[in-house]
A protein has these predicted regions:
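Structural detector of well-ordered beta-strand residues that form the stable sheet scaffold
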Residues: 54, 83, 104, 157-158, ...
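Short beta-strand-to-turn element immediately C-terminal to the catalytic PLP-Schiff-base lysine
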Residues: 183-184, 198-203, 243
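Phosphate-binding glycine-rich loop
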Residues: 30, 35-81, 95-99, 105, ...
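PLP-dependent aminotransferase-like
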Residues: 71-136, 140-161
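Pyridoxal 5′-phosphate
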Residues: 16, 76, 256
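N-terminal "arm"/small-domain region of PLP-dependent enzymes with the aminotransferase-like
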Residues: 1-30, 35, 309, 349
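Conserved active-site segment immediately N-terminal to the catalytic lysine
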Residues: 159-194, 221-226
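PLP-dependent aminotransferase class I/II
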Residues: 8, 37-42, 47-54, 60, ...
């Protein structure tokens, strides 16, 4: 069986260094707000290209803290509208509604699966205050046109970089392109912890100070609480092992890109659509392929076929946010592109532990689907 993703294999690549780093933390007797966290925050800020990195508990907390910080600073207010891609993972939207803000769902582009920049302007009202730009599946969703629309309308540009660690736009990395960015280090991510972890990156000194305080119970001085905060901190063990894995992130992403490039060039089946193929092959965008999505009208049959042949796949995601019970009030929204993507999307194995032979098999099986 070709597993979709084996975390055991992923971590085995650097196991000795990880074990040594964790043992050092264990022996130190210091498990929060210590040197390992400070070191990782400094290294990750340098990697992303921002002045600040603030570690926190997970990616959802990172987004939630950004919106909350902007409210405390008087930039955002209850009921303000935040544009967000309709096909994102639900955490993006949870962070908005948790802060008393109003998500405005914008359809994606079927060719790229990212927010359709042609539709952004038509969704802007006098209550719109920000765009939450999600680099979904590892593909850079930022464009000069998106940035210009935000500038023209005075919108905050907030990045959800949970799936695109190391991705670039020109000579800058995602996570440094907007006013602030949220990062998730969930174990399955390209830069993954061994538990939950996240971070906020920004060049805004005031925002960084507020995010750090809000994630520490609302405190910037011990036992003095200026805000109603929460407990969302990056612990020393997660920080230490993330610092090890960060050194290899570009190398690991390069292997993902090599496999994805073969998928784009060698998968040839009229029943299967490869989103982003033209842009990738033309060098028009960067992608670190956290997920390699394909689209197929017979998605469920294709998934069963691959499973029978020994290839595990996943679906990202089977139910769109506006069809989830938690957002039942949106059930009447007409989002046909989003719903089509959620019906057709299938995620192929694509990671740095895969062999050429495994890649060969996946390509051969896909090219043979429906051609018996």
């Amino acid at each position: 069986m070709i597993e979709y993703l084996s975390l055991q294999k992923i971590n085995a690549l650097h196991e000795q260094e990880i074990v040594e780093a964790v043992e050092k933390v264990v022996r130190s007797g210091w498990y929060l707000h210590g040197q390992a966290t400070e070191r990782f925050e400094r290294h990750y800020a340098d990697f992303i290209g921002t002045r600040h990195c603030i570690g926190c508990g997970n990616g959802l907390d990172a987004l939630t803290l950004i919106f909350r910080a902007y409210k405390e600073l008087g930039v955002l207010h209850d009921g303000d509208e935040i544009l967000v891609p309709a096909n994102t993972f639900v955490a993006s939207i949870l962070s908005i509604t948790e802060n008393g803000l109003q998500p405005i769902l914008v359809e994606p582009d079927y060719e790229t699966l990212e927010i359709d920049e042609r539709l952004i302007e038509s969704h802007i009202t006098d209550r719109t205050r920000a765009l939450l730009l999600v680099h979904l599946y590892g593909r850079c969703a930022y464009t000069d046109e998106v940035a210009e629309q935000c500038r023209r309308h005075g919108l905050l540009l907030i990045e959800d970089n949970a799936q695109a660690h190391g991705c670039r736009y020109g000579n800058k990395r995602t996570g440094s392109l907007g006013n602030a960015a949220a990062h998730s280090f969930y174990p399955g991510k390209n830069l993954g912890a061994m538990g939950d972890a996240g971070a906020v990156t920004t060049n805004d000194d005031q925002l960084a100070q507020m995010v750090r305080a809000l994630g520490n119970y609302g405190s910037s001085r011990k036992y003095v609480f200026d805000y109603v905060g929460r407990n969302s901190r990056l612990d020393e063990i997660q920080a230490a092992l993330l610092d090890v894995k960060l050194k290899y992130l570009d190398e690991d992403n390069k292997r993902r890109q090599q496999i994805a490039d073969r998928f784009y060039r060698e998968i040839d089946n009229p029943r299967i659509t490869l989103p982003g193929k033209r842009r990738w092959l033309n060098g028009e965008e960067d992608n670190v392929f956290h997920i390699f999505p394909i689209l197929c009208a017979d998605r469920d049959a294709l998934q069963s076929y691959l499973k029978e042949k020994g290839v595990q796949t996943l679906i990202h995601y089977p139910i769109p946010p506006h069809r989830q019970r938690c957002y039942a009030e949106w059930g009447d929204l007409s989002l046909p592109v989003t719903e089509r993507i959620h019906r057709e999307e299938l995620s192929l194995p694509c990671n740095q532990t895969m062999s050429d032979n495994e890649t060969d098999l996946i390509i051969d099986l896909l090219n043979g689907f429906g051609r018996s």
